[in-house]
C-alpha cells in the first residue's frame, strides 16, 4: 500500500459518511435558522444552538442527556466546522483503515460523549458548547496510541510527528478564548484509552517512514 492511500477514503467509508452528515447538519440548520429569524449564513446564534441540542449543564441535569450526543453534530460557524472536518477527514480515514468501521465509530462517539461529560463537569452553568472537537480529539488520541504501540513507526505516521501534532492541537486551544479545552482533553484521553483496549498490532503495519 502506498503511504498516501491511508489518507484517502476507503470504499463505503464510514468516516466520509460522518463528515457528510455533520456538514449536512450545519447547512440544514443554517437554512432553518435563517427561515425563522431572517438572519444571515455566517453561523448560528447561541440561543438557537441552545434550543437545538447544544451542551448545557442545567439542561443535562434535568434529564436532557441526548445533548451529550447531539452537540457533536452542531457547529457555531463555518470556520469551526471546517477545522474539525479537515482533521477528521485526514486522520479518520487512516484510523478507520487500521481499526475497522465498528471500532472506529465506537471511538468517535464514545470520545464525543465523554468529551461532553468532561465539559459539563468542568465548565460553569452558563457555558453553551457545541462541536465535534471532542470526538475529533478522540480520533487524535487513538491514533497517538497506535503510533506508540508500533514503537513510533506506522505507515504514514511517526512518533515525533504525532506527538508534535497532539501538542500543537492542545496548545492551540489555550491561545484563544471560547475554546472548550475540557472537552478537548477529555476526548483525547477517552480515545487514547479506548484504543489501548481494542487495538491489536499486526505485523504488516510497522514501517519506517521518512
Predicted regions mapped to residue ranges:
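A detector for small-residue-rich transmembrane helices and their helix-helix packing motifs
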Residues: 1-210
